[in-house]
Amino acid sequence: MNDFSKEAVKPADSATAAAKAEKRSRYAAGVMKYREMGYWQPDYTPKDTDVIALFRITPQPGVEPEEAAAAVAGESSTATWTVVWTDRLTACDMYRAKAFRVEPVPNPAEGEPQYFAFIAYELDLFEEGSVANLTASIIGNVFGFKPLKALRLEDMRIPVAYLKTFQGPPTGIVVERERLDKYGRPLLGATVKPKLGLSGKNYGRVVYEGLKGGLDFLKDDENINSQPFMHWRDRYLFAMEAVHRAQAETGEVKGHYLNVTAGTMEDMYERAEFAKELGSCIVMIDLVIGWTAITSMGRWARKNDMILHLHRAGHGTYTRQRNHGISFRVIAKWLRMAGVDHAHAGTAVGKLDGDPLSVQGYYNVLRESHNSVDLTRGIFFDQHWAGLRKVMPVASGGIHAGQMHQLLDLFGDDAILQFGGGTIGHPSGIQAGATANRVALETMVKARNEGRDIANEGSDLLEAAARHCTPLKQALDTWGDVTFNYTPTDSPDFAVTPSVA
């Protein structure tokens, strides 16, 4: 029965009618500009539950920056190249990504206009606990889009509601230090060199010498898996024999990162289980195994009380170029979500590319409970980590004892300093190389704790210590003047810093 007592419905005002007409026009058949389809919304206010991505866009000539930003939003969410009627079967206004802010990049290095585009994504667009699904949207298809000359994902804000669906690191910095009973200093490591070609027995000898000399860890390199010259099982047996012997002789907890990277997940699980049976406290994986495999190994490590080390093998193919690819600060966030305990994050002073402030930003993303906006270190968003455990950053690649003061000053205590060639290339042998690094580290930690200015006094402090430590003196004589002083290819847009090398 009709209720005529209710107030009659008033005709829509002109603004409402215009809005409805504009909305209907988005579904006219044919090709429309992305910003006309609703992917450019400058008045949009992001919600606390939105995933926000910051892209550096370089439009093709003639493409307006707002249209380029809208295209990125569209192609990384719900759009295709033409209007489709099935949009009307979805809550497309909610699911549509929204480019809400575009601003020019200050002083673009390439000399052509670049823009920062801020894009918000509804949380329902992503599967819970899946970095693979997150990346399939954010970087899955849009990087090959023709209207863009180049595209780079610079940073992301991950909402707490989404972070809570991830396990995060299986062990974390606090629990790892408890297991190792090592506090108040960075951990020391080294990569076995040469990375390929050693027999299992000689490999184990390198591990023993390094640990006996004072290192906390030795490690496999990224490409040592199971090759004809050394089957993985042989390497594990000899390496763990060395670990147990060094532990018994030094009274310290030691470890070796046994690389379980393999061609299938079944093989990786088999290797990890064998490492655990041998008494290892840690296993290692490579970034190239992919996000689903990383997450799976993180869950295995959590269930089995193992530390999980990640080598960022392959990252330079997409992180190094300033105008195209993905910043490593984003990779660092994804790694923390997927669940690793260690992650290589740069040295600033070694042989691998990395601006000092940018590298500090990567470290902060991995090991802080909350990241505040810090444009000088490339951090664009406040990021609350919702209780996810902290990842221990790893400095590795072309570093030596003569740089110990720089490394400690840059990165502090919660880091792992890995000296591969700087240990195994020592003129008096591996054990002497390890001792040189341990003495250099303890010298710097003691001086810092006494209030000394290690950044400026470090070289003199090392020289003084070397008068009482022949291995350190030999290390300084061999590598003291070795630097890799090149201009970084990627540095923060809001602060230009020289190399510290």
UniProtKB/Swiss-Prot annotation:
Highest rank taxon of the organism: Bacteria
Textual note on the cofactor: Binds 1 Mg(2+) ion per subunit.
Enzyme Commission number(s) from the entry: 4.1.1.39
Keywords: Calvin cycle, Carbon dioxide fixation, Lyase, Magnesium, Metal-binding, Monooxygenase, Oxidoreductase, Plasmid
CDD domains: RuBisCO_large_I (cd08212)
Reaction(s) catalysed by this chain's protein: 2 (2R)-3-phosphoglycerate + 2 H(+) = D-ribulose 1,5-bisphosphate + CO2 + H2O; D-ribulose 1,5-bisphosphate + O2 = 2-phosphoglycolate + (2R)-3-phosphoglycerate + 2 H(+)
Modification type N6-carboxylysine: residues: 219
GO MF terms, alphabetically ordered: magnesium ion binding; monooxygenase activity; ribulose-bisphosphate carboxylase activity
InterPro entries: RuBisCO, RuBisCo_large_chain_AS, RuBisCO_lsu_C, RuBisCO_lsu_C_sf, RuBisCO_lsu_fd_N, RuBisCO_lsu_N_sf, RuBisCO_lsuI
GO biological process: reductive pentose-phosphate cycle
Residues annotated as site: Transition state stabilizer: 351
Pfam families: RuBisCO_large, RuBisCO_large_N
Positions of the catalytic residues: 193 (proton acceptor), 311 (proton acceptor)
Cofactor: Mg(2+)
Binding site for Mg(2+): 219, 221-222
Function recorded in the entry: RuBisCO catalyzes two reactions: the carboxylation of D-ribulose 1,5-bisphosphate, the primary event in carbon dioxide fixation, as well as the oxidative fragmentation of the pentose substrate. Both reactions occur simultaneously and in competition at the same active site.
Protein family according to the UniProt entry: Belongs to the RuBisCO large chain family. Type I subfamily.
Subunit structure: Heterohexadecamer of 8 large chains and 8 small chains.
Note: The basic functional RuBisCO is composed of a large chain homodimer in a 'head-to-tail' conformation. In form I RuBisCO this homodimer is arranged in a barrel-like tetramer with the small subunits forming a tetrameric 'cap' on each end of the 'barrel'.
PANTHER family noted in UniProt: RIBULOSE BISPHOSPHATE CARBOXYLASE (PTHR42704), RIBULOSE BISPHOSPHATE CARBOXYLASE LARGE CHAIN (PTHR42704:SF17)
Full protein name: Ribulose bisphosphate carboxylase large chain
